[in-house]
Amino acid sequence: MVKAIYYTVKPCVPRDLQLFIRRNIIQYKRKKCADIWPIDEFAGETPLNWQRWPEKKKFALVLTHDVEKGDGQNKCINLSKIEEDYGLCSSFNFVPERYTVSPVLRLYLENRGFEIGVHDLNHDGKLFSSQKTFESRIPKINHYLKEWKAVGFRAGAMHHNLDWIGKLDIKYDCSTFDTDPFEPQPDGVKTIFPFWVQNRNGGFAELPYTLPQDFTLFILMKMNGSEIWKRKLDWIVEKGGMALINTHPDYMYFNNSDYGKERYSAQIYRDLLEYVVEKYNGQYWNALPRELASFVKNINCENVSIQRIE
């Protein structure tokens, strides 16, 4: 109910006021949630029947990006080049009906070895407002999945209902997180490992993000460095888990002319990648989400079902 009211009145509330309210809520919540954010020790438990990462790597590194608005597309190539500088690959998720998604950009990224995913349908916050609403949007979402040859989905604002999401034609979903009490739907899955969601269609892999989102750290909390990312990453490596990050090119600036109040320097992201590559050289499996989904599915098909510890 509260979420429905929020998205109804949100268009009428000035952006600066929205940010002011969210920042104050986070400031209050952060003190209360210090024992579960950014690290929830429970989430580091190894799942039942877990197997080692491919090639005996110590942990998985998964880079994903949600392109929130049309202008964000203009920064995708710059962002991809930063990752290429370090020999890394990632996925870019676009919102099909919020802006015109550039087929030229999609083709460019695909040809460079990046993955394309579907991010919600129009990002209006209403996808999960009712089962009827969700099911009415399934045909369109599936249409874009097929048209883009995409196999992965992420809902707007990390809203999620895994029973409903399983009705999409996907191999994986990434609309959840291990722990994030600052999200509109704050129920984390409490694991830093991927897991299989079984359903009547066979199932799909769920890939929760495990590093805090950039918008939370740099826009709402106004941090100016990658220290929390690095601290959480080190903990994930220690546990042998999956370091999955979700960033937004929309909020990055690559030169001073693009600086703004809802921007943070792309150098912070570059700093994180440099840290990973230098400190953990040869120890990580940098997988595309679809590759990770196949890994999880193969384990499940071998009757070694990955189960979360409840």
Q: Would you name each region that the model predicts?
A:
Residues 1-38:
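Membrane-proximal basic amphipathic "stem/tether" segments
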Residues 68-74, 93-104, 124-135, 152-163, ...:
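Acidic-and-aromatic substrate-binding clefts and catalytic sites of carbohydrate-active enzymes
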Residues 9, 66, 116-119, 153, ...:
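Conserved, mostly hydrophobic/aromatic
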Residues 60-62, 89-91, 113-117, 152, ...:
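Structural preference for beta-strand elements that scaffold enzyme active sites
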Residues 44-47, 229-310:
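C-terminal domain-boundary segment and adjacent tail
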Residues 27-38, 48, 140-244:
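Active-site-adjacent pocket scaffolds in enzyme catalytic domains
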Residues 27-115, 157, 161, 221:
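Active-site beta->alpha N-cap acidic-glycine motif
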Residues 47, 76, 80, 103-107, ...:
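Generic structural signal for well-ordered alpha-helices
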